Amino acid sequence: MGLTIGLSLLGIYRLPDIINRFLFRPYYFVRDRQYDTMVMSGLIHADLGHLLFNMFTFYFFAFPMERYIGTTRFLILYFFGLVTSHLCTWYKQRNNPEYASLGASGAISAVLFAYIVYFPTTSLMIIPIPIPIPAVLFAVGYVGYSYWASANSNDRINHDAHLCGASGGLAFVAATDPSAYARLMTIIA
């Protein structure tokens, strides 16, 4: 978290070349062997609002997840979500030389969805709407909106990263703790 905040602030306020250097550009990812951008772009955010929103979400879900599954598994989950989201983005945008992406949203979506599997009775809120939403319903709405926005929106948000990061989080739990899904089904049934 500290590294992400530090690099992002440095890029936003002091060295904008850092942001340009580590943008994830699917078209150039393989052509120019920009493999480091798959991870580095997830450590840098384009602006203060993007950074604050992602770090706020990270704060509320990452620390409980780390305590629950342990530091090693948490780090694997986080980076698996980051890589999964970038691979999906690469696949969709690999022929688009204009496309670029930045931020940790895919990794954070992976953490969020793993959290929902482990803690399905939790209520979540969407900022700034102060209405508690059951975690499972939140997940359905999140996926539905992200899918719709991926197909219909021009808002400079990588909605595919949200979808693929969420899928990565669900796959991670399925691979490392399949019994979590049995507990989830018992609770929501």
Locate the predicted segments by residue.
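A detector for small-residue-rich transmembrane helices and their helix-helix packing motifs
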Residues: 1-189
